[in-house]
């Protein structure tokens, strides 16, 4: 069993969580001391502060393999190489929901995936490819994709239960679907916890021989998060069935890691995280079809959906927000505002009044009161 810790990437997509660069470096060192196999350091193209953090983490004398997120985009893939990393994490969905969101045919998406994997390999990068929303993807199409990418030279293949709808029984049936196509013990798994099944799904996958499980400190991540690293370590230390590396992870530094993460959480926001969307890619999907990233309609339980204005926001999400507040959203104005948002490391707004007040500066040219910038740890 291997562990990929994604606290620094997926964790920061959680509403209420921001890590200053120094905290990211400390967390990387602690995770390395714990012996995790991979540390996912972020999505460098998302914001300048993330790029800087990746540069500084890459300069540390760590034993864990560092991996960075990139879309199917040559510039983003090249950026990962230029920042000094050896591993890139590419991702894409191939199911009907994903194709609708991309506005592409399945063949066009396959071609983009293939071209991106080949380009990354040409640059000398090791490639992990994640099929987004794999749990809601036709098993035959999934098997075809994995088999094709293995032939192209992808080093690792990952299965993402993006909205947390999988069950242990479905994970067991997945193993049978991949017989003759891809050994189960070469797969990575990324389980979300929207329905409370991330940990049992992970345990099932490990028992069946999965190669690697994604986890994060305190289980933080987009919406309800994912597998908590501390749960995974405690389980393996207590003789979890199927683990090939029992006793090789150090659990002693865990308390410090938890403290570092806790200090970076805005508790008021964190408590509202289950239906909050912070990643630009997720916001784009939600705007097109909420089912893309919500397994349950939030209104059914008396909650409401929150679109978070932060450095992780993309053009589609911002265009929707600007339209909502009656601000001109032509390309020039959009990029001017987006550049400003991405430059503010700890900006995080989800309430209509806060967002409206913040956006007034782009209507009137006035400075925004400091109270509308939410700093980590407050």
Predicted regions and their residues:
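A mid-to-C-terminal "edge-of-domain" accessory segment
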Residues: 1, 7, 241-378
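Structural preference for beta-strand elements that scaffold enzyme active sites
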Residues: 1-3, 38-40, 63-69, 85-89, ...
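N-terminal capping/small domains of soluble enzymes
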Residues: 1-72, 309
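Conserved, mostly hydrophobic/aromatic
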Residues: 11, 31, 88, 129, ...
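Active-site beta->alpha loop and helix N-cap motifs at the rims of alpha/beta catalytic domains
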Residues: 32, 38, 43, 63-128, ...
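Glycine-rich, proline-tolerant flexible connector loops at the mouths of alpha/beta enzymes
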Residues: 36-61, 92-104, 132-133, 159-169, ...
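Alpha-helix-loop-beta-strand connector modules within alpha/beta enzyme cores
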Residues: 47-71, 110-125, 171-189, 232-240
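Catalytic alpha/beta core domains of metabolic enzymes, predominantly
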Residues: 163-292
């Amino acid at each position: 069993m291997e562990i990929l810790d994604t606290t620094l990437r997926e964790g920061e997509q959680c509403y209420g969580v921001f890590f200053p660069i120094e905290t990211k470096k400390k967390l990387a060192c602690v995770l390395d001391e714990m012996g995790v196999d991979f540390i996912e350091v972020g999505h460098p193209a998302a914001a300048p502060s993330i790029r800087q953090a990746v540069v500084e983490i890459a300069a540390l004398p760590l034993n864990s393999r560092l991996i960075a997120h990139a879309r199917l985009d040559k510039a983003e893939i090249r950026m990962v190489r230029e920042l000094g990393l050896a591993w890139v994490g590419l991702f894409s969905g191939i199911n009907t929901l994903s194709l609708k969101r991309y506005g592409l045919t399945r063949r066009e998406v396959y071609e983009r995936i293939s071209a991106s994997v080949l380009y990354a390999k040409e640059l000398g990068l090791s490639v992990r490819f994640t099929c987004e929303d794999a749990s809601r993807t036709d098993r035959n199409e999934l098997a075809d994709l994995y088999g094709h990418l293995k032939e192209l030279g992808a080093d690792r293949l990952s299965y993402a239960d993006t909205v947390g709808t999988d069950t242990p029984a479905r994970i067991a049936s997945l193993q049978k679907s991949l017989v003759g196509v891809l050994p189960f013990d070469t797969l990575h798994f990324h389980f979300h916890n929207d329905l409370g099944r991330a940990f049992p799904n992970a345990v099932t996958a490990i028992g069946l021989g999965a190669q690697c499980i994604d986890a994060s400190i305190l289980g933080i991540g987009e919406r309800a998060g994912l597998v908590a690293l501390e749960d995974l370590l405690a389980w393996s230390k207590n003789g979890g069935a199927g683990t090939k590396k029992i006793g090789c992870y150090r659990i002693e530094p865990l308390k410090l890691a938890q403290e570092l993460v806790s200090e970076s959480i805005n508790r008021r926001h964190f408590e509202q995280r289950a239906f909050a969307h912070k990643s630009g890619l997720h916001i784009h999907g939600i705007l097109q079809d909420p089912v893309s990233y919500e397994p349950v309609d939030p209104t059914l339980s008396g909650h409401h959906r929150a679109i978070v204005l932060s450095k992780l926001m993309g053009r589609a999400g911002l265009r929707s927000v600007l339209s909502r507040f009656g601000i001109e959203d032509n390309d020039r104005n959009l990029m001017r505002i987006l550049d400003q948002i991405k430059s503010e490391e700890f900006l995080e707004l989800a309430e209509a009044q806060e967002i409206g007040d913040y956006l007034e500066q782009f209507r009137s040219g006035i400075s925004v009161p400091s109270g509308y910038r939410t700093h980590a740890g407050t």
